[in-house]
Amino acid sequence: MKLKIAVWVLLLSFSTLLFAQQKKTYTYATKDGQELQLDVYAPDFSSKSEKLPTLVWMHGGGFSGGVRDNQSETKLCETATKQGFVAVSISYRLLRKGTSTYFGCDCPAAEKKETFKQAAIDYMDAVSFLIDHSDDLHIDTDKIIAGGSSAGAEAILSAVYMPEYYLDGAYDQISFAGVFSLAGALVNLDEITSKTAVPTVLFHGIADNLVPYSKAAHHYCNPKDAGYLVLNGSDKIVDRLSLLGTSYLFYSYEKGRHEISGIPFGDLTDVFDFFKSTIVKDTHITKTISR
């Protein structure tokens, strides 16, 4: 019996070690003396040359908090690998951390836009690093999905849909195959064009009190507030995608507030199935799920 227990413990430890070896951490940039890192989670590969669709995830936290390797982000990435994806979770500069206004109605609108821009730049630098090392990391550079929650969603939506507005064409060599946004919004809806529109999954609560579900001021600031900045939320993004004939999967929560920015683990199978269908099989899907 003791021998069986010892063997079982050894096998369990070995399997845990094997799984842990699938996560690797890299520094993709150093800015303002801060090393910006990313974690790459990968499934077992059938061959050294195999490349897979890749989710590149940006955590939330109001641009003042959050970490790339918290429990939820880690679980998301592990789930993605089980679905046959490479998953990456990135750190980025938290430019509102320690400021007196943070990211609310006292934060000037110009600073909010600059925060979106710098976060988008960090995101694109991370993706550039991944593309440069795509052979070693088994990344299919034609099937990169940009994903993020709350502040992270705002950043990735800016990076994917508004590259000319925020990035001045500096990353034109990068293209995305999909978007996965949790309670995100963007400044200019017209920047979503036939060139930038890609299959998109969005989750948003109609009663979101921070990031507007439709078109409204960020944090619902008053017009006289320094931080008054009108954003277009998921509902408006879906309208634009529909107009352009682009695939989308939209989860709309009637009474949902900003907690909908949490990772929807119960729906991840459907989310990844959507990307497999639209990105891999080129199937056209337009679906709204109301809850």
PLM segments and residue spans:
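Alpha/beta-hydrolase active-site loop
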Residues: 107-135
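Alpha/beta-hydrolase-fold catalytic nucleophile elbow
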Residues: 91, 147-149, 180-183, 203-204, ...
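Short substrate-entry loop that stabilizes the transition state in hydrolases
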Residues: 46-52, 57-100, 188-189, 209-212
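The feature captures the conserved acid-bearing segment of alpha/beta-hydrolase catalytic domains
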Residues: 169-244
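Bacterial Sec-dependent N-terminal signal peptides
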Residues: 1-22
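N-terminal cap/lid segment of alpha/beta-hydrolase-fold proteins
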Residues: 20-50
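Primarily recognizes the serine-hydrolase "nucleophile elbow" in alpha/beta-hydrolase
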Residues: 83, 127-196
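C-terminal catalytic histidine-bearing segment of alpha/beta-hydrolase fold enzymes
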Residues: 235-291
